């Protein structure tokens, strides 16, 4: 049993990963910058970030070498601890370097799993790609759902302590702690505002990594819920062993929870065979076929678990209980709900015929049309009612360049929302973009839309549809004959992680 428990424990780093010397290597920052630059696929003109030049990196490393944190003088009160006069200039560089360095032990562990040196455990399913089978699951038999807003740590020290279980290099952790305390306001990092001039999307990588490591510890207590209902569940005995060890964790937690007044921990609470769990960013969903009382017990359990195990204040209002038949799940930029599909069946017995009305529950995932139209209206592609309008463009842009920009936006939206079961809203978005493109070109040439489309022919339509044919051929080579198959099938693309800004409907078009 001890061997089983040792295997099922969250994998920790058993060796000392000496990461501290890497902080002073120039190539680390070059790799970090190159990775962030190559992933900016949504920006039209990424350009070159002059704040990440090699000369500035050399000055930063020299300043860190020469800085002595044990010597404190009155003249150093306004001095930057890393030898930098401009905090906003050096903060993104250090953040990118730290993010690249602390991910090294996790990357090495993943590579060893892929090479077959270790068994790939269920924790590896906790990625953005595990959301796809979750949305494909059959929810029609479920009754209630918990919408959970995961609390954020009140202090960065909690994050550093969590990372200490994985990385045993004390020097790098001390420097990371010093950097976070000196530069960072945790609340503004998780929920950045427009007034923060030193904050950018690329600088979020380090803090999201620390936050996800923290949530990983929280999810380890009931990760088996995702395995049971997922299409990715393992067929080996690993899931059974994991569940046995999970009950052992719950029994140990009972000794803690019984100290709370009016609280009783029941093991049957976590033995419900039909539970669905998934998380994306700070929001998680827990669905079950249980009763309202059953879900209230889960709510009480989660609140107590956060407060006692993580020393975080978790307000009960962060968890809402909703009946699935009257509630839509907002997740990953999709809306999912259980709907009643009515059907009429004619039954005939000898000379008598009967009409039988059947109501079948169906779980549908569709595109949230209202937020998308609001985003398009904000970007001047249409008005608030969804009517396409012309977009002002520079006079030096060629027609092919304008068509390519509109087509790229349309392809990204179509690519991202291709997993929806209802395509009608997606057709409307594509219609808005296509007509807006035509009106923009007609405005540039001082012509009417009808005359311009007649002169342009099918070129504009091919630009908006050609990419879908190519993707269909790569994904389903046996069904690439008709375009109709694209609209009816549900396709989940694995590179959706690169364009997940569309989930927040705040993408800059």
Curated annotation (Swiss-Prot):
In its UniProt record, a GO molecular function of this protein is:
RNA binding
Keyword entries, A-Z: Chloroplast, mRNA processing, Plastid, RNA-binding, tRNA processing
Query: InterPro entries in the record, alphabetically?
Result: Domain_X, Maturase_MatK, Maturase_MatK_N
Any Gene Ontology CC annotation: chloroplast
Keyword check for ATP-binding: no
Principal subcellular localisation of the protein: plastid
Asked if Nucleus is a keyword of the record, the answer is: no
One record GO biological process: tRNA processing
- Give the subcellular location: Plastid, Chloroplast
The protein's role, per its UniProt record:
Usually encoded in the trnK tRNA gene intron. Probably assists in splicing its own and other chloroplast group II introns.
Question: What family name appears in the similarity comment?
Answer: Belongs to the intron maturase 2 family. MatK subfamily.
Q: What is this protein's name?
A: Maturase K
Species name for this entry?
A: Jacaranda mimosifolia
- State the taxonomy lineage: Eukaryota, Viridiplantae, Streptophyta, Embryophyta, Tracheophyta
Q: Which gene encodes it?
A: matK
